[in-house]
Every structure is written in C-alpha cells, then in structure tokens.
Amino acid sequence: MLSIGMLLLLFGMFREKYASSDSASEATQTNVEQVGKVKNIIFIIGDGMGPNQINLVGDSANNFERSHSIGFSKTYSASHRVTDSAAGGTALACGVKTNNGVLGMNADSVPVQSIMQELRQSGLATGEVASCRITHATPAAFYAHQVNRGMDAEILSDLYKYGPDVFVAGGNKLISTDSLQNAGYQVTYSLDSMANIADGKVACILAEEDMPTSPMRGDTIAQGVLQTLRLLEKNEKGFFLFIEGSQIDWAGHGNEGERLRAEMKDINRVIGVCMDYADQHPGTLVFITADHETGGLSLPNEELTPTFSTGSHSGVMVPFFAYGTGADKLTGIHENTDFKALLLSLVDCR
C-alpha cells in the first residue's frame, strides 16, 4: 500500500511538473479562473483505478496529465476498511458512508439523494455512460436506493422512476423496453440510431449484459459520451454526466495485465474527449476519480509489467483529478464523501 508520505510526494511531483506549463495551458487556466460558476459537470469514475493503473496509459497523450489539479480520496466504507463498488459509488454519488453492498442509502438504510438527483431537481439535464450494464453497482449508485446491490428487479424499478435523462450502457437482458417507454424514454440499440434522435429522454442499450472488453468494443464509450453530450447540452441550465470505465475493475479482479492496460487506454481516450469538450464549452468541470483500487497493482521493473498482490479490492487511497471551470477548488486529501457537497457548491444554478 502507498503510504501518506508517498502520496504527498506524488502530489508534490505533479504540482511541480505542471506548475510551469506552456503558454496555451496557462491561457486555459486563466480562462478557467475567469468563468466562475460551473454550468456542466462531467463526473468520471475509473472503477478500480489506483495510482499505478494510471501509469499503464503511458507517457504519450496521457490526458490525466492535462489536469489542472489533483488530490487523493479515502475509500473505506462504513462497514469495511476495504470498500466494494456499491458503498464506494454511494459515497461519491450521495456524500455518505454506507455498508458494503448498499446503494444510495446511508449506513442505517435511509435513502439519500445523489448529486445527480439533486441537480435534476435544480433543472439540469442528467446522463450516464458506462461499459457495464446500467444496473451495475456504480452507475446504480447515482439513481437507486436499495439495501443490496444484487436486487436487480428493485434497481430496475428505480431506473424507470429515477434514472438519468439519457443513458448509454448494457443490460438489455434485464431491461423492459415497455417500462422504459412508459417512463418516457426513446429506446435505441445503436449509436447510429441514437444520432437520429434530436432531444428528449433516451436509453441507448448496446449489449445484452455488459459491453465487450477493450479493445473489442472500439471507441464505443467515447462515441457514446459525444452522443450523450449532444443531447444534454440542449438544456440551457446545464447538465450532469456520469461516466464509468467499469471494466478496469474486472481486469484487476482477474489479474489480467494487458486487459487492464487496454481498459486504461480506453478511459484515457474518454477523458480526452471530455477535456476537449470543456475547452470548447466554458463553465464545464471534468472531475475524475475511482471508487477504490483493484488488484493491489505494482509495476516492478523497467517494462512496467503489471504485477498483482490480490484478486480483490485494496484499501489504498485513490487519486482524483479536475479540469476546467472550478478545478482549482478541488485539491488535497479528502474523504470520498466530500465530493458531492464540493461539486454542488460550484454549480451556477444553486
């Protein structure tokens, strides 16, 4: 596990390396400070993504290095020193520690609204894009309120009632098209057909269960993000978009080094798309973090060969990165429960 001292050293190295950026980056940072309040939030979770996973992206076109600020997040849950994705996702989405396995509730099983739900009540559009099924623990933490992450039928009921305005994910095997349509969704099964939808609620379901692994799914997630942004940006008040690199976690569980490298390169591509969008749309904040680290990854030799110490999650702190409007307010070491309030405090409509 990384010690506090090592984390602070990494933090200092990042600050030193990027404090003296080129003139273009300095101009971007100046614009960031001038814009003020945030209109749009793009919240990205790399499930299972610890500090060493980020090294697998490589030095070429590493979009994490474009970040305006960086910090670290503590990931323990209310019940365990090592969290699962349900409790970790709930902490990030709802701002409360809860027990492993619980979605959208505190440790006493009382439902708590997520940042996505609160911003929708304030009039913002909402969206989700994930490489897993839409009912999986992390995406579900932003809309569901259930005592057990395995309660698929109940989570689906919450999706129909409280789900995002637009989503791109898997899960067709479980989902009822009639129920989605009754909830006001236009249902589509390809990004090409999604591109023909001008506005309104949209469910784009791209797999029976979870999406294929990277690189077999190509740039599906990045393209899904672009399609979702196209629809969400029509809301003049702004939007909240949640994105998950779901299968980083699964590669860690399987101790599959090259699969992990491919998944990290995919989320890096998605982050680049989002940062480019923020450059073109002042008032947009891109926030990137993880719910936990998976695999106890180390990179012990010159070839950076992925080496794992566990097939489960670990208890290390995970990094977070911020880019765009308000990024300067997000730095340091935080509880994972801090980010909901921090992000809400930056939003223009509140």
Label each residue range with its predicted role.
Residues 18-171, 176-194, 200, 293-350:
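N-terminal catalytic scaffold of extracellular/periplasmic and nuclease hydrolases
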